[in-house]
């Protein structure tokens, strides 16, 4: 009987495709491993897939030793990726393709505001007690005359965000989340050197990699409305989001190296077993002594 109930349950639960996507700008500490573990376990619970993506688009800060340490930590704790590991640095042609698509369809545009102009705009808004945001100077609109294109400024690419209404989604941890659309503004999706920005590449990759469920730290909650703008502009489906509380230091701030947090492999060097680290990370899920 119980086996039949389990089989019915497994058929009804949608197989989740999840991921963990660290940036190799430093080591992976216990907080990151915990988030990865939640993502891994959710995929396995639903007979789905867990994927690993290395977000290495920041050439100035990337650290090859950090990449190796991340991969070693995942191997040690027994959380292998179910698919080939993706590296964002190898996907720039893909990002350019979708940026060009947005430009061609009128969902993105070139902005020629200089750094000095942007700084002056910010200073003016702050002096008026306003939230600093882009003012749409270069946003094309019916009946609007755009400024003359300057010779000395390489443009950035901005996506057209909605100017009215709300951006809403249901978070699997926090419930219904609503953001005023006019607080998102037309954010940059490609820098003046052509490099795509974080929120753009994350949304594109999650869509193309087939993510159904995105489990990540709640420090990414504010990124979600921007990523939803990208999903909608490109016609992608929006995954389910689960924003997990982070491990904090005694003062309530995000745990960091300054607080004595060590990298994942540091626990191995100290003689900890991977099973012990695994169980410690699962305490929030209700695992404890005797269970």
Task: List where the protein language model places each region.
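Short, histidine-centered active-site or binding-site loop motifs used for metal coordination
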Residues: 20-24, 54-56, 204, 208, ...
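Active-site cores that bind ATP or allylic diphosphates and position pyrophosphate for catalysis
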Residues: 109-110, 114-243, 248-255, 263-264
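Non-catalytic terminal extensions that flank enzyme cores
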Residues: 1-27, 47-50, 164, 242, ...
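Short, polar/flexible loop-turn hinges at active-site or ligand-entry regions and domain interfaces
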Residues: 81-82, 109, 215, 267, ...
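Hydrophobic alpha-helical scaffolding
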Residues: 60, 88, 216-220, 266-271
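N-terminal Rossmann-like or analogous alpha/beta NTP/dinucleotide-binding catalytic cores
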Residues: 5, 11-127, 222-236
């Amino acid at each position: 009987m119980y086996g039949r109930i389990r089989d019915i349950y497994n058929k009804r639960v949608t197989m989740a495709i999840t991921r963990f996507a660290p940036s190799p700008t430093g080591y992976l500490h216990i907080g990151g491993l915990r988030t990865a573990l939640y993502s891994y376990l959710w995929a396995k619970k639903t007979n789905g897939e867990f994927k690993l993506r290395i977000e290495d688009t920041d050439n100035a800060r990337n650290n090859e030793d950090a990449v190796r340490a991340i991969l070693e930590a995942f191997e040690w704790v027994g959380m292998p990726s179910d698919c080939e590991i993706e590296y964002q640095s190898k996907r720039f042609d893909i990002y350019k393709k979708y940026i060009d698509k947005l430009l061609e369809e009128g969902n993105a545009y070139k902005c020629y505001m200089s750094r000095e102009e942007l700084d002056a705009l910010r200073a003016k808004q702050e002096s008026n007690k306003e939230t600093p945001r882009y003012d749409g100077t270069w946003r094309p609109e019916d009946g609007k005359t755009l400024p003359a294109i300057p010779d000395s400024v390489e443009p950035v690419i901005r996506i057209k965000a909605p100017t009215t209404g709300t951006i809403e989604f249901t978070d699997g941890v926090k419930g219904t989340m609503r953001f005023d659309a006019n607080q998102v503004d037309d954010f940059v999706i490609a820098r003046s050197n052509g490099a795509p920005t974080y929120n753009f590449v994350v949304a594109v990759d999650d869509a193309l990699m087939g993510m159904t469920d995105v489990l990540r730290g709640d420090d990414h909650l504010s990124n979600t409305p921007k990523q939803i703008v990208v999903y909608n502009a490109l016609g992608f489906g929006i995954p389910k989001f689960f924003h997990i509380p982070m491990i904090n230091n005694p003062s309530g701030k995000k745990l960091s190296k300054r607080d004595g947090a060590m990298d994942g492999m540091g626990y191995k060097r100290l003689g900890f077993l991977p099973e012990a680290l695994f169980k410690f990370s699962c305490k929030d899920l209700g695992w404890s002594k005797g269970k």
